Amino acid sequence: AVTKACQGMLGEVYSRAYNMDIIMVRAFNHIGPAQSDMFVVSDFCRQTVMIEKNMHSPVIMVGNLTAKRDFTDVRDIVRAYSSLMKSGKSGQTYNVGSGNAISIQQMLDMILEQSSVKISVETDKSRLRPSDVPIIEADISKITDDTGWKPSIQTKQTINDILDYWREKEK
């Protein structure tokens, strides 16, 4: 958090002092096809596909499902960056996200709804973090006001696209 604050302040200082066109972005959780399975949504999707293909027992291993995060399709994030390049104000910091935090449990439920097989869920203690912020949610009013940008891809569509990516990759 401290490094992010310092980075933002440096951007503002350089923008003013050297008349540089600098726009700072605080991007929240990106999700989308081809994302590494080191990230929760892609991990759950990959596990689901492995189970569907009988390459894994029908159990998804999870960590904390109560945490709420602001997930946004990476394709919407790219559109946000493009909008900021065209209409963002130099020296300003913009939050880029969906503006809506949803629980990891809700994400998992959406993934399991799209699965072709019955899957159980088990907690793996090694996936639990010693400290987890309960809710992280972006206030996107500034980027919307300044550029007109809002995310347009529905979470269920993103999940479908991620599942399709893993279904193709794990042939």
What does each model-identified segment do?
Residues I77, Y81, V96, M107, ...:
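Non-catalytic, hydrophobic alpha-helical segments
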Residues V2, Q35, F39, R69-R75, ...:
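Residue-level signal for the nucleotide or nucleotide-sugar donor/cofactor binding architecture
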Residues V40, F44, S103-S115, T158-I162:
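PAPS/PAP-binding and catalytic site of the sulfotransferase fold
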Residues V59-I60, N64, G91-Y94, I102-D109, ...:
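C-terminal "lid/loop" region of Rossmann-like NAD(P)-dependent oxidoreductases
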Residues A1-I23, C45-E52:
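Active-site Tyr-X1-5-Lys
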Residues D21-R26, Y94:
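Rossmann-like NAD(H)/NADP(H) cofactor-binding core
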Residues A5, H30-R46, K53-P58, V74-R75, ...:
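Glycine/proline-rich active-site loop of Rossmann-fold NAD(P)-dependent oxidoreductases
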Residues T155-K171:
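Amphipathic terminal alpha-helices
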